[in-house]
Every structure is written in structure tokens, then in C-alpha cells.
Amino acid sequence: MAIQSKYSNAQVESIIAELLAVLEKHQSPTDLSLMALGNCVTHLLQKKVPAEAREVVAEQFAKALSRSVKS
């Protein structure tokens, strides 16, 4: 069963396009891009997710990321 998102595809695609445009603007190689994006994820987890939920959210994110590259 597909997971329903509360965000539209247009919202998600717009943010992705902007993030990728910034990385392209800086001619960021893949390893630097992944490092920067990973640091952004860490920042969001630390600033926007309650401490008691961070580990679970991080694990869910990691599992979703792993599944997305297997498909």
C-alpha cells in the first residue's frame, strides 16, 4: 500500500529543484553534496524534532533512504 503524503508532489519537487540548483551553482561534487545535505538533516533533527523522538525519526529517515536507493 502506498504511503499518502500530506505534501503535494509539486511542493516536494519545488524544494528538491531549489536544493539541487544551489548544489549545481556551487559545482558541488557528490561527496560534498551528500555531506552538506546530511548536515542539513542533522540540523533539522536537532532543531525541529524533540530530543526524545530524534533517534526514532533518524532511523525512519535512514530506512526510507535505504529503500529509495534499492528501487
Swiss-Prot record:
InterPro entries: UPF0352, YejL_sf. SUPFAM superfamilies: YejL-like. It comes from the Bacteria. Belongs to the UPF0352 family. This is UPF0352 protein Spea_1764. It comes from Shewanella pealeana (strain ATCC 700345 / ANG-SQ1).
